[in-house]
Amino acid sequence: MKASMYLALAGLVLLFVVGYASESEEKEFPRELLSKIFAVDDFKGKERGCKGFGDSCTPGKNECCPNYACSSKHKWCKVYLGK
């Protein structure tokens, strides 16, 4: 019983700390997280010759950036997992 009380208290403290940390973070956190996950800088706004994740493309034209492939079903660039 005593251990479960300490565990519940620790959980509440952890929830408070995570909530406070997320409030204090900059608003750019979701964009930074996505750019790190997909290893591209889609949100920087700079011009490039290839299309990034989620951009529309034409299958077979090789318009997508490296590590991406044009989906023939959806017609947008997606992560290429290889075969």
Curated annotation (Swiss-Prot):
<keyword id="KW-0528">Neurotoxin</keyword>
<keyword id="KW-0732">Signal</keyword>
<feature type="disulfide bond">
    <location>
        <begin position="64"/>
        <end position="77"/>
    </location>
</feature>
<keyword id="KW-0872">Ion channel impairing toxin</keyword>
<keyword id="KW-1015">Disulfide bond</keyword>
<protein>
    <recommendedName>
        <fullName>Hainantoxin-III 4</fullName>
    </recommendedName>
</protein>
<dbReference type="GO" id="GO:0008200">
    <property type="term" value="F:ion channel inhibitor activity"/>
</dbReference>
<keyword id="KW-0738">Voltage-gated sodium channel impairing toxin</keyword>
<feature type="disulfide bond">
    <location>
        <begin position="50"/>
        <end position="65"/>
    </location>
</feature>
<feature type="propeptide">
    <location>
        <begin position="22"/>
        <end position="48"/>
    </location>
</feature>
<dbReference type="GO" id="GO:0017080">
    <property type="term" value="F:sodium channel regulator activity"/>
</dbReference>
<comment type="subunit">
    <text>Monomer.</text>
</comment>
<dbReference type="Pfam" id="PF07740">
    <property type="entry name" value="Toxin_12"/>
</dbReference>
<comment type="similarity">
    <text>Belongs to the neurotoxin 10 (Hwtx-1) family. 15 (Hntx-3) subfamily.</text>
</comment>
<keyword id="KW-0027">Amidation</keyword>
<feature type="signal peptide">
    <location>
        <begin position="1"/>
        <end position="21"/>
    </location>
</feature>
<feature type="modified residue" description="Leucine amide">
    <location>
        <position position="81"/>
    </location>
</feature>
<dbReference type="GO" id="GO:0090729">
    <property type="term" value="F:toxin activity"/>
</dbReference>
<dbReference type="GO" id="GO:0005576">
    <property type="term" value="C:extracellular region"/>
</dbReference>
<dbReference type="GO" id="GO:0044231">
    <property type="term" value="C:host cell presynaptic membrane"/>
</dbReference>
<keyword id="KW-0800">Toxin</keyword>
<keyword id="KW-0960">Knottin</keyword>
<dbReference type="InterPro" id="IPR013140">
    <property type="entry name" value="Huwentoxin_CS1"/>
</dbReference>
<dbReference type="InterPro" id="IPR011696">
    <property type="entry name" value="Huwentoxin-1"/>
</dbReference>
<feature type="disulfide bond">
    <location>
        <begin position="57"/>
        <end position="70"/>
    </location>
</feature>
<keyword id="KW-0638">Presynaptic neurotoxin</keyword>
<comment type="function">
    <text>Selective antagonist of neuronal tetrodotoxin (TTX)-sensitive voltage-gated sodium channels (IC(50)=1270 nM on Nav1.1/SCN1A, 270 nM on Nav1.2/SCN2A, 491 nM on Nav1.3/SCN3A and 232 nM on Nav1.7/SCN9A). This toxin suppress Nav1.7 current amplitude without significantly altering the activation, inactivation, and repriming kinetics. Short extreme depolarizations partially activate the toxin-bound channel, indicating voltage-dependent inhibition of this toxin. This toxin increases the deactivation of the Nav1.7 current after extreme depolarizations.</text>
</comment>
<keyword id="KW-0964">Secreted</keyword>
